[in-house]
């Protein structure tokens, strides 16, 4: 059984398509559920000012999960005949869950599509725009610009109750990797210097941070180029209003630290295992990140089929994608 979510008032466990959900709990309190001792997150001081939801790697138009280029190894999962496309199943279930928390904003951090085709973007818009309207804020990912498309390009500054979001366009059209220009970093620096509230920075590509397997600097790094990553970390070091950078792209949950101590966060994809979206609870004294596994029966049936994608390549996708609980559910303190 997976312990998937722990918030300040919520604990959720999953086993297959079975969900055990415990609500209305007390913060920083240990409970015994399903034979496990589980402690809820502490609640930051002050009032709850807003809730913000994010998704990434939603991939409308994708028809095969687990496919790597032209390889036949997998396992590769496809929707059965007569079933709706799995991006529709996963995203429509995510939208229903997100709408239930009444967020002040829904941020989409790229890879709306499989190949940036008009019908794929139209499917994304049909799913997300009607329920959220002007609260929906979108930036592109690499899959949206492989043919040089310009849809959803550009940086955005989004002011919300208790927090601002700096949504960065990290895409290099025609490329898988990402970067940030000096002009973008100056824009972020100027906005952070003038900000009258804490700021979360978001983008599609994850940051390069030295350590582990990342000590080799390369412009072929799968995420943000190392020089741009370092420059982003330098802005964070100068501007304590910047609390965290959160990205997608890797289809995993992970938290690392910049040299200044600010967290650099990756959030998993909507489209396959474990199939998640993230909630940010903004309090006067800090922010709680709560990752939710999409839990409709049809969504769980699909995401469970994807638990062992890439197994034939020796990849433990289950562990990689799910990450540690503290990577999914954590407190982001004020700096």
Language model segments and positions:
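A short C-terminal boundary segment appended to hydrolase-like catalytic domains
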Residues: 15, 284-335
């Amino acid at each position: 059984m997976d312990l998937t979510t722990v918030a300040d008032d919520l604990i959720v466990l999953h086993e297959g398509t079975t969900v055990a959900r415990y609500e209305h709990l007390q913060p920083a309190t240990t409970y015994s559920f399903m034979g496990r001792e589980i402690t809820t997150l502490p609640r930051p001081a002050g009032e709850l000012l807003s809730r913000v939801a994010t998704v990434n790697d939603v991939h409308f138009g994708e028809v095969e999960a687990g496919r790597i280029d032209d390889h036949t190894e997998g396992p590769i999962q496809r929707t059965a005949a007569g079933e709706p496309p799995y991006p529709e199943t996963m995203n429509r279930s995510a939208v229903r869950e997100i709408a239930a928390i009444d967020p002040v904003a829904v941020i989409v951090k790229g890879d709306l599509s499989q190949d940036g085709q008009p019908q794929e973007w139209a499917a994304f818009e049909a799913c997300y725009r009607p329920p959220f309207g002007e609260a929906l804020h979108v930036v592109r990912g690499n899959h949206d610009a492989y043919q040089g498309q310009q849809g959803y390009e550009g940086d955005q500054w989004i002011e919300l109750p208790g927090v601002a979001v700096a949504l960065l366009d990290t895409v290099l059209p025609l490329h898988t990797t990402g970067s940030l220009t000096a002009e973008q970093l100056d824009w972020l620096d100027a906005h952070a210097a003038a900000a009258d509230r804490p700021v979360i920075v978001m983008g599609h590509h994850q940051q390069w941070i030295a350590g582990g397997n990342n000590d080799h600097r390369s412009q072929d790094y799968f995420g943000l180029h190392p020089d741009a990553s370092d420059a982003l970390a330098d802005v964070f070091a100068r501007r304590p209003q910047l609390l965290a950078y959160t990205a997608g792209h890797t289809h995993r949950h992970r938290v690392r630290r910049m040299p200044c101590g600010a967290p650099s966060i990756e959030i998993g994809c909507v489209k396959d295992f474990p199939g998640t979206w993230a909630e940010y609870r903004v309090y006067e004294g800090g922010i709680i990140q709560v990752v939710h596994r999409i839990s409709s029966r049809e969504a769980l049936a699909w995401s469970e089929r994807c638990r062992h994608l890439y197994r034939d390549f020796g990849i433990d996708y289950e562990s990689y994608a799910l990450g540690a609980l503290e990577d999914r559910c954590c407190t982001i303190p004020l700096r």
